[in-house]
Curated annotation (Swiss-Prot):
UniProt similarity note: Belongs to the class I-like SAM-binding methyltransferase superfamily. MenG/UbiE family.
HAMAP family to which the protein is assigned, alphabetical: MenG_UbiE_methyltr
Organism whose genome encodes this protein: Vibrio campbellii (strain ATCC BAA-1116)
PROSITE patterns from the UniProt entry: SAM_MT_UBIE, UBIE_1, UBIE_2
Reactions the enzyme catalyzes: a 2-demethylmenaquinol + S-adenosyl-L-methionine = a menaquinol + S-adenosyl-L-homocysteine + H(+); a 2-methoxy-6-(all-trans-polyprenyl)benzene-1,4-diol + S-adenosyl-L-methionine = a 5-methoxy-2-methyl-3-(all-trans-polyprenyl)benzene-1,4-diol + S-adenosyl-L-homocysteine + H(+)
Name under which the protein is recorded: Ubiquinone/menaquinone biosynthesis C-methyltransferase UbiE
Positions with a binding annotation for S-adenosyl-L-methionine: 82, 103, 131-132, 148
UniProt KW Ribosomal protein keyword: no
Signal peptide: none
Length: 259
């Protein structure tokens, strides 16, 4: 696989960042990412199932299993979009617990709210439109924070990780589920062909939007690899960090604690 990923925010000045393979002003990236998710929100769940063959459900189940969430706890599902993880956490924490589904994109948040309410998930779930870089919550507030398939879209990942660290309770844990770098060369070649050729065509057919899914493929390539992201988490203050490669490293789950 050609390594197009100039890791994270390196090689960029303070006013620019990556939008896929393109260098843009930071404010422009925020706008462009918002446009992507406004466009795909209605078909997001369908495309997730098609793109992953349903395997995303197993990745999310593993994330839940690694969260250690218990009844009565506070959980933040950051960038939670259509609410898959929120639904599961709601059942775990119960009536005495509290789950916040937070997303910067109101279209995704509305889809998630409607889906969860249609499934009878009410009472212990609240919805907040929030920027991961400037979370509007008190210090030391959450027992568990998850951010699933979202961090790669964040403009300043280091700032977002510091913000998550601030609102996490001592003893709490952060879980970052995200596309990553395949660890097997043959898999990398197949994955490249799938991502850059088949994926945009699927987006065009199902969501009438090839460009957003082309951005998806590019954003995955520009996201920090497993070791780099672990280093960023440590730099933000997280300890006992560890990552798990899932499906040959196509996805990785990173875990870190605040002590």
């Amino acid at each position: 696989m050609t390594d197009t990923s100039v890791q994270s925010n390196t090689a960029l000045d303070n006013d620019t960042t990556h939008f896929g393979f393109t260098t843009v002003a930071k404010d422009e990236k925020v706008t462009k990412v918002a446009e992507v998710f406004h466009s795909v929100a209605a078909k997001y769940d369908i495309m997730n199932d098609l793109m992953s063959g349903g395997v995303h459900r197993l990745w999310k189940r593993f994330t839940i299993d690694c969260s250690g969430a218990r009844p009565g706890q506070r959980v933040l599902d950051l960038g939670g979009g259509t609410g898959d993880l929120t639904a599961k956490f709601s059942r775990i924490v119960g009536d005495q617990g509290h789950v916040i589904l937070a997303d910067i994109n109101n279209s995704m948040l509305n889809v998630g709210r409607d889906k969860l309410r249609d499934n009878g998930i009410v009472g212990n779930v609240h919805y907040v439109q929030a920027n991961a870089e400037e979370l509007p919550f008190p210090d030391d507030y959450f027992d568990v924070i998850t951010i699933s398939f979202c961090l790669r879209n964040v403009t300043d990942k280091d700032k977002a990780l510091r913000s998550m660290f601030r609102v996490l309770k001592p003893g709490g844990r952060l879980l970052v589920l995200e596309f990553s770098k395949p660890i097997l060369d043959p898999l990398s070649k197949v994955y490249d062909a799938y991502s850059f050729h088949l994926l945009p065509k699927m987006g065009e057919l199902v969501a009438n939007d090839a460009d957003s899914y082309r951005y998806l493929a590019e954003s995955i390539r520009m996201h920090p690899d497993q070791a780099t992201l672990e280093g960023m988490m440590k730099e933000a203050g997280f300890e006992n960090t560890k990552y798990y490669n899932l499906t040959g490293g196509i996805v990785a789950l990173h875990r870190g604690y605040k002590f």
